[in-house]
């Protein structure tokens, strides 16, 4: 590998290590939906009480669909944000609560904790790989984690950044690499038992999309200047059509981050709901046959599919971010080429 290439990649890791803490604030705290997310222990206790009480009158029996409602509460408890971590059957860790600021709950939630964990992993990973690259000479090749990260960097650099942005892609590569790794780790950690999927929180995905939006607009202003940026809003049409074109172009500016927000949030949330729903089928029907024939096999299949989706959604978000930047910075005659890639 050429020395210039080594120095360039080393620089990418150093910049990413500096940029990773910026994503610590990639959230807007949400209040826990306690009324929609009953603790698992309460559900188990309710079932136990009904089972050991032989004198339970039929008039006091639970409605037919009550068990379904309890199952739904447990599912939502695992999906929604909250101020506690449940480690059944070991107990629950309650996170610190802070007084509201201007009516906004800024208390620490489980999704905030997951964001901190992901950011810490990124800092350690990028620092480790950066240190490994500093020891590499032009006659040696990276190995282990550094080799894996080099392949990832080259993939994002060539197939995502360079192919979609073109000239000047180097300035945006650190952000694209960081956001890809950040989303990927958030998705993967959400599949681990006792973990939580921060990207299943629409506030997190919205903040990431806002980052892309402002970076895109800043890149467009830098590439075209203020006059060129405003001219782009008219789409090169006659002034008589500006009253129609300008609102359409302005709406188009905000539909892009909206699409990024909803796509990532919906895909990550839906996958977890499907997995938990399949698991609870056997409990609702109280059948080991259903569990063995349907719930377990399909849950494993969906779980493996979710691992693939975790990588896919991180790639799609990064690819679309690069595409939006490329379209915003493309000059006349280059926009079609950027769209083609």
Swiss-Prot record:
Pfam families xref list: ATP-synt_A
Transmembrane segments: 112-132, 173-193, 195-215, 242-262, 273-293, 307-327
Location relative to the cell: Cell inner membrane
Signal peptide per UniProt: 1-33
Main location: membrane
Known partners and oligomeric status: F-type ATPases have 2 components, CF(1) - the catalytic core - and CF(0) - the membrane proton channel. CF(1) has five subunits: alpha(3), beta(3), gamma(1), delta(1), epsilon(1). CF(0) has four main subunits: a, b, b' and c.
Function of the molecule: Key component of the proton channel; it plays a direct role in the translocation of protons across the membrane.
Family: Belongs to the ATPase A chain family.
Protein name, as recorded: ATP synthase subunit a 2
């Amino acid at each position: 590998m050429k020395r210039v290439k080594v120095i360039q990649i080393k620089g990418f890791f150093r910049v990413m290590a500096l940029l990773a803490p910026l994503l610590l604030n990639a959230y807007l705290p949400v209040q826990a939906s306690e009324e929609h997310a009953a603790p698992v222990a309460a559900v188990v206790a309710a079932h136990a009480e009904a089972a050991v009480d032989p004198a339970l009158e039929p008039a006091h029996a639970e409605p037919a669909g009550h068990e379904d409602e309890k199952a739904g509460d447990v599912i939502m408890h695992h999906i929604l944000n909250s101020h506690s971590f449940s480690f059944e059957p070991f107990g629950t860790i309650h996170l610190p609560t802070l007084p509201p600021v201007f009516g906004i709950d800024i208390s620490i939630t489980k999704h905030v904790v997951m964001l901190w964990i992901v950011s810490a992993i990124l800092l350690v990973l990028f620092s480790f790989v950066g240190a490994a690259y500093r020891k590499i000479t032009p006659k040696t090749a990276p190995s282990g984690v550094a080799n894996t990260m080099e392949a990832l960097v080259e993939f994002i650099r060539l197939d995502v950044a360079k192919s979609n942005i073109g000239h000047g892609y180097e300035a945006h590569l650190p952000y694209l690499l960081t956001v890809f790794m950040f989303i990927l780790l958030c998705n993967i950690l959400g599949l681990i038992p006792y973990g939580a999927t921060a990207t299943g929180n629409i506030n997190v995905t919205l903040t990431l999309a806002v980052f892309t939006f402002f970076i895109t607009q800043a890149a467009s202003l830098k590439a075209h200047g203020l006059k060129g940026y405003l001219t782009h809003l008219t789409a090169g049409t006659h002034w008589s059509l500006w009253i129609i074109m300008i609102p359409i172009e302005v709406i188009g500016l905000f539909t892009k981050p909206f699409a990024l927000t909803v796509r990532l949030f919906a895909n990550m949330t839906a996958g977890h709901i499907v997995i938990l729903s399949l698991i609870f089928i056997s409990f609702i029907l109280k059948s080991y046959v259903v569990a063995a024939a349907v719930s377990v096999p399909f849950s494993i299949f969906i779980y493996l599919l979710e691992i693939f989706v975790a990588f896919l959604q991180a790639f799609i978000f990064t690819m679309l971010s690069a595409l939006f930047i490329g379209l915003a910075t493309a000059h006349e005659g280059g926009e079609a080429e950027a769209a083609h890639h």
